[in-house]
């Protein structure tokens, strides 16, 4: 338990219990794990609230209906995708620099389908994320949900989705919860690896993001997936198909 906590101080007793079962084949009930954590003074790191919500584009070229309508359950991979962009900061001396992460999340297995990291929050950031997802999942035609950020309301982006055979869906104005699984992933990433740290180079920040997404997809178990990782959930579906 101390090893799990030392490797990931963000984990509370419930996630420690899940890791014991998943990674070490040790079955123990939550109350016992909680008692041991208290005796060893094991506490999860402070949880920060994620307040991110993209502002609507000033002059949207295309707005889709909220076709997802908070129906976040999916029966198979590539049935429903969500996407968003989030911002990070790093410091070089007294200068503050920004970095932007665009990602696509699958609502069936909660895996990160694709992501792109760039210095600017612009159309290519989002367009390239979609292109990477299509390349990694040929033939996929998911319902594609986003907020009303300027990239997603761009006519070129709409045409890219249409060419790929994807139906577009958008959150209602100012309704962050319409995109809550994606917003939730940002919160998880930032709570577990970003908040409370000061990054002093671009490379350090990029390495953190890339390594975390690999960890999230391949090693981080989730209770809503049946104490499986996103990749395990994805592979189980493929084996059963």
Can you say where each PLM-predicted feature lies in the sequence?
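Mobile genetic element proteins and their domesticated derivatives, centered on retroelements
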Residues: 1, 16, 33, 37, ...
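Basic, flexible linker segments flanking DNA-binding modules
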Residues: 1-76, 175, 229-238
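RNase H-like polynucleotidyl transferase catalytic core
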Residues: 46-52, 144-148, 162-181, 197-200
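An active-site-proximal beta-strand-loop segment
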Residues: 70, 74-113, 119
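Active-site beta-loop-alpha junctions of metal-dependent nucleic acid enzymes
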Residues: 97, 116-137
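Acidic/histidine-rich, metal-coordinating catalytic segments
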Residues: 139-154, 172, 228-231
């Amino acid at each position: 338990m101390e090893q799990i906590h030392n490797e990931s101080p963000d984990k509370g007793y419930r996630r420690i219990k899940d890791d014991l079962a998943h990674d070490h084949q040790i079955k123990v009930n939550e109350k016992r794990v909680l008692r041991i954590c208290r005796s060893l003074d094991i506490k999860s790191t402070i949880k920060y609230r994620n307040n991110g919500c993209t502002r609507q584009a000033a002059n949207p070229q295309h707005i889709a209906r909220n076709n997802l309508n908070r129906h976040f359950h999916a029966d198979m991979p590539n049935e429903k995708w969500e996407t968003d962009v989030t911002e990070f900061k790093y410091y070089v001396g007294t200068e503050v620099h920004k970095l932007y992460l665009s990602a696509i999340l699958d609502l069936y297995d909660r895996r990160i389908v694709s992501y792109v990291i760039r210095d600017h929050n612009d159309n290519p950031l989002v367009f390239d994320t979609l292109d990477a997802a299509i390349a990694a999942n040929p033939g996929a035609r998911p319902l594609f949900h986003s907020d009303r950020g300027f990239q997603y309301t761009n006519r070129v982006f709409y045409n890219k989705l249409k060419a790929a055979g994807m139906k577009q869906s958008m959150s209602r104005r100012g309704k962050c919860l319409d995109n809550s699984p994606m917003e939730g992933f940002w919160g998880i990433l930032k709570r577990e690896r970003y908040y409370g740290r000061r990054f002093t180079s671009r490379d350090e920040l990029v390495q953190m993001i890339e390594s975390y997404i690999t960890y999230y997809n391949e090693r981080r178990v989730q209770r809503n997936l049946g104490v499986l990782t996103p990749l395990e959930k994805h592979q189980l579906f493929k084996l059963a198909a």
